[in-house]
């Protein structure tokens, strides 16, 4: 869905490789230990996946005027993916979802051990903010980098993604006592928060890296308005994405999903299928998909209007909006 995913993959691995090289000069870790750590830390990244969040960051940024292959943009997108991957490694642990399969491969704790998987997740989360701290070296304005740190840390922190997981655990094994409002709150926190941040980081990077930034985004209130629209888009995508996930978990097998199917039902988790039935959940996913595309159109109107006024709306920008529309549509009507 994104023709330049290979560039992102390179940044994901190269960042950890650079950290390994830096650590090699400190004489506290042997070459064998460094290689072992590097293998462990890159394992969940190399498993692949949809790369939904970093692709959203890149596509939103391009729609806001950023060059497609700008190093600072790729660094920001990689930071988003590190945070997401860390959350998956921790979610799969026996004390959480206790899953053996992720992205079609054995989960990290099955390969390296439970305690080691905990450390792998910790390492990826820490590395994400190390990347953002260095983003200015790649051409991102320091104020934009700082705001990216603020948004990502809040979305992934105690009152964002972590709160969602906490709330999810509280209702696991007690799903009958919960309702639709509770489910939406879990999905908004656990999934929507980081997707919202991914879109917001795209706006911040895109507006900062655009060659027409001074003309298009000179009014700070304008950027804030675009930022809010992007966050609303990400939150709506998150809820739709998770409901689609609930339907797929109930209707597909493990090979089709690349992860263990039927786990939600086995663990008595609160899901859209449990509350609405398979058909009802599918209808709700369709409604939210349409709502997400409306949110995207709102974001486009806010941004493209400013770009047109500054004569910076061109064929590249138009293509980026089209790619973003296609990406979101394919994401929310997926079958695996």
Which ranges hold each PLM region?
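All-alpha prenyltransferase/terpene-synthase fold signal
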Residues: 1-336
């Amino acid at each position: 869905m994104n023709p330049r995913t290979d560039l992102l993959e390179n940044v994901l691995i190269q960042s950890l490789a650079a950290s390994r090289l830096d650590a090699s000069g400190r004489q506290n870790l042997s070459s064998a230990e460094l290689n072992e750590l590097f293998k462990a830390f890159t394992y969940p990244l190399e498993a692949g996946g949809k790369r939904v969040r970093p692709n959203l960051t890149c596509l939103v940024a391009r729609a806001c005027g950023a060059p497609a292959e700008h190093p600072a943009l790729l660094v920001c997108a990689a930071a988003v993916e590190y945070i997401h991957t860390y959350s998956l490694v921790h979610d799969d642990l026996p004390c959480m979802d206790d899953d053996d399969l992720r992205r079609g491969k054995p989960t990290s704790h099955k390969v390296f051990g439970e305690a080691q998987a905990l450390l792998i997740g910790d390492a990826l989360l820490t590395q994400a903010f190390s990347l953002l701290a260095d983003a200015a070296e790649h051409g991102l304005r320091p104020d934009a980098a700082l705001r990216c740190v603020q948004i990502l840390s809040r979305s992934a922190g105690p009152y964002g993604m972590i709160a969602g997981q906490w709330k999810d655990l509280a209702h696991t094994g007690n799903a009958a006592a919960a309702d639709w409002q509770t489910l939406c709150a879990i999905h908004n926190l656990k999934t929507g928060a980081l997707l919202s941040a991914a879109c917001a980081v795209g706006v911040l990077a895109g507006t900062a890296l655009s060659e027409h930034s001074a003309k298009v985004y000179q009014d700070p209130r304008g950027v804030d308005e675009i930022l809010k629209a992007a966050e609303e888009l990400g939150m709506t995508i998150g809820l739709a994405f998770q409901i689609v996930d609930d339907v797929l978990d109930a209707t597909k097998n493990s090979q089709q999903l690349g992860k263990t199917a039927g786990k939600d039902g086995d663990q008595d988790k609160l899901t859209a299928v449990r509350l609405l039935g398979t058909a009802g959940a599918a209808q709700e996913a369709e409604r939210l998909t349409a709502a997400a595309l409306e949110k995207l159109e709102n974001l486009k109107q806010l941004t493209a209007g400013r770009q047109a006024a500054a004569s910076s709306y061109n064929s590249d920008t138009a293509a980026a909006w089209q790619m973003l529309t296609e990406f979101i549509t394919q994401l929310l009507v997926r079958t695996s």
